[in-house]
A protein has these predicted regions:
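The feature captures the beta-strand-to-loop junction immediately N-terminal to the Walker
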Residues: 38-40
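H-loop/switch region of ABC-family ATPase nucleotide-binding domains
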Residues: 184-185
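Helix-to-loop junction immediately C-terminal to a conserved catalytic motif
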Residues: 53
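Conserved ABC ATPase "signature" region
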Residues: 102-120
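Helix N-cap at the start of a conserved alpha-helix in ABC-type nucleotide-binding domains
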Residues: 160-162
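Conserved ABC ATPase signature
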Residues: 124-128, 132
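Catalytic Walker B motif of ABC-type/P-loop ATPase nucleotide-binding domains
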Residues: 149-152
Length: 236
């Protein structure tokens, strides 16, 4: 069976003032992919993620499979009203995403159970640890039942235990059939989670390979230099 493209980005270029953030990037996201966008700071990872999600204007073409229309989710860092409870943050987010009012309570309960936060549902979001806040962000995304999930550095600034919890949730989402595109500075995380690795340098895609191939001895050019770099192998 041929892979089903959910999202196609063609010839996308993005400029912020004097900075060329993306240069003629083309990328296809297939159903079931878990794509890790990797590269040095300023390589274009976050800009590409936002172009894929339709959050930044670009000069190219973005085509979304009709079956995925309206079923996307983006995990932001600290996307909460901190004075509201975990429960109310989740209900508001699901309502804004278009979940029918009659389904809000059940959907919120299911999402909290999925990420292990049921016992904290009445606690203010500001009282959560960093790892718990990220699990709340994942609950908000999971509750929308997205075909496509976008994550920007989902474990940045988390301690090792919290990172493992978040990674376990993402592995579970992928097993459930969710298609995921994630930017990360952590090559170890990309190797553990992703099915494809896309390496960016200077706003251009320099490599787009299955994970096993990307981390093999066959890798060439700038991508190989990146994987061998001192910072690249600071596996967290």
């Amino acid at each position: 069976m041929n892979p089903v493209p959910l999202l196609i980005l063609e010839n996308a270029s993005v400029r912020f003032g004097d900075v060329q953030a993306l240069r003629d990037v083309t990328l296809t996201v297939q159903r079931g992919d878990f794509i890790a966008l990797v590269g040095a700071n300023g390589s274009g990872k976050t800009t590409l993620l936002r172009a894929l999600n339709g959050m930044v204007s670009h000069s190219g073409v973005r085509r979304l499979n009709a079956a995925a229309t309206g079923r996307q989710a983006m995990v932001f860092q600290r996307p909460f009203v901190l004075r509201l409870s975990v429960w109310n943050n989740l209900r508001v987010a699901l309502w804004l995403a278009g979940v029918p009012r009659a389904e809000l309570a059940q959907r919120a309960d299911e999402a909290l159970a999925r990420v292990g936060l049921v016992e904290l549902k009445h606690r203010p979001a500001r009282a959560l640890s960093g790892g718990q806040q990220q699990r709340l962000a994942l609950a908000r995304a999971w509750g929308v039942r997205p075909d496509l999930l976008f994550l920007d550095e989902p474990t940045a600034s988390l301690d090792p235990s919290a990172k493992k919890e978040v990674e376990a949730l993402l592995e579970g989402f992928a097993r459930e059939g969710m298609t995921i595109v994630m930017s990360t500075h952590n090559l170890g995380q990309a190797k553990r989670l992703a099915s494809r690795v896309v390496y960016l340098d200077g706003g251009q895609v320099q490599a787009d390979l299955p994970t096993a191939w990307f981390f093999s001895d066959a890798l060439q050019g700038r991508a190989h230099q990146f994987t061998q770099g001192e910072l690249a192998w600071a596996l967290e």
